[in-house]
Amino acid sequence: MELGVSSQLWLWLLLLLLPPVPGREKESGSKWKVFIDQINRALENYEPCSSPNCSCYHGVIEEDLTPFRGGISRKMMAEVVRRKLGTHYQIIKNRLYRESDCMFPSRCSGVEHFILEVIGRLPDMEMVINVRDYPQVPKWMEPAIPIFSFSKTLEYHDIMYPAWTFWEGGPAVWPIYPMGLGRWDLFREDLVRSAAQWPWKKKNSTAYFRGSRTSPERDPLILLSRKNPKLVDAEYTKNQAWKSMKDTLGKPAAKDVHLVDHCKYKYLFNFRGVAASFRFKHLFLCGSLVFHVGDEWLEFFYPQLKPWVHYIPVKTDLSNVQELLQFVKANDDVAQEIAERGSQFILNHLKMDDITCYWENLLTEYSKFLSYNVTRRKGYDQIVPKILKIEL
């Protein structure tokens, strides 16, 4: 016997009111709702930088210089120089001068390259540039003193500058990078070529990490890899401080792997080292999805990279890492979109011109707070440009 129209309507209403059968919900709508909602909120609140130059980062310069708006006196600068917290530089009549001491000559050389690129447009000034890994001006220090450092946490007043590694002086990795990481312009080209060879659909879906044990925060991922190698391929390599297998958690050190070969993998992990990790910017250019562990350590460009928009944020203790990996595997299109946004940001807003631009803007703004005329110190040598290297 056929049902009447009214009976059919009641039947449909009854079906709509019944609870769903367990296990039949769409994963993106239920199991992964928390992550999907976080991504949607992040995108709603995100304002892309459309500027063609480094003005995307101007807010970082303003914030870093805020403690010194009362002025930097000759007496304050003399005290900063005396304390040997960094290398003392002077710019006078568009020439660069430096004290003879530099703890890491290749790092100083990387810094000097960028200053010399823009020195013709800079006013007279002097500054102390820290080329150690660690920042020097904790916020409890009174008064705050002007020290330039490449990386810091929110607990420091150091003024961030683009690291020397954009040109030279990065950590040496034998045998693949014996001269150290550098030449960001050339690295960009190599990574873009590798990314083209490994489009998203061809990439290995095992999460990947290779690096030395510069921080024990990396340990949980290494241990997870040993437990579940299909989910994560993570191993420790040697560094200059390596003494025994204790430094690689009881296993032989793995071979170092070129950054371009990381592009074979969909999911790449970034950890802090002693301070911020130099690999971070490189990983994005693989077109892979970056898993960024912790949010404490910063470089000047980090604030413009947003969690869930450009990368996947991971808790410092990695307690949520397995769930996050399961999420991206179950939501491949979402993962690819985040990877593409991260890659495009670095391609568009972290070019070599942006680095040079940031140096010029930073030093120009900083010079406005010096309340005295700079005079050249005796015994300081003039720094002149070096011959350009054209390949890695």
Curated annotation (Swiss-Prot):
Signal peptide: 1-23
Pathway of action: Protein modification; protein glycosylation
EC number of the protein: 2.4.1.376, 2.4.2.63
Catalytic activity: L-seryl-[EGF-like domain protein] + UDP-alpha-D-xylose = 3-O-(beta-D-xylosyl)-L-seryl-[EGF-like domain protein] + UDP + H(+); L-seryl-[EGF-like domain protein] + UDP-alpha-D-glucose = 3-O-(beta-D-glucosyl)-L-seryl-[EGF-like domain protein] + UDP + H(+)
Region named Interaction with the consensus sequence C-X-S-X-[PA]-C in peptide substrates: 103-107, 172-178
Highest taxon above the source species: Eukaryota
Keywords of the record: Developmental protein, Disulfide bond, Endoplasmic reticulum, Gastrulation, Glycoprotein, Glycosyltransferase, Signal, Transferase
GO biological process: axial mesoderm development; circulatory system development; gastrulation; muscle tissue development; paraxial mesoderm development; positive regulation of Notch signaling pathway; protein O-linked glycosylation; protein O-linked glycosylation via serine
Key word Glycoprotein present: yes
Positions with a binding annotation for UDP-alpha-D-glucose: Y177, S212, R218, V274, A275, A276, S277, F278, R279
Family affiliation: Belongs to the glycosyltransferase 90 family.
Function: Dual specificity glycosyltransferase that catalyzes the transfer of glucose and xylose from UDP-glucose and UDP-xylose, respectively, to a serine residue found in the consensus sequence of C-X-S-X-P-C. Specifically targets extracellular EGF repeats of protein such as CRB2, F7, F9 and NOTCH2. Acts as a positive regulator of Notch signaling by mediating O-glucosylation of Notch, leading to regulate muscle development. Notch glucosylation does not affect Notch ligand binding.
Protein name per the record: Protein O-glucosyltransferase 1
Organism this protein belongs to: Bos taurus
Lineage: Eukaryota, Metazoa, Chordata, Craniata, Vertebrata
Gene from which the chain derives: POGLUT1
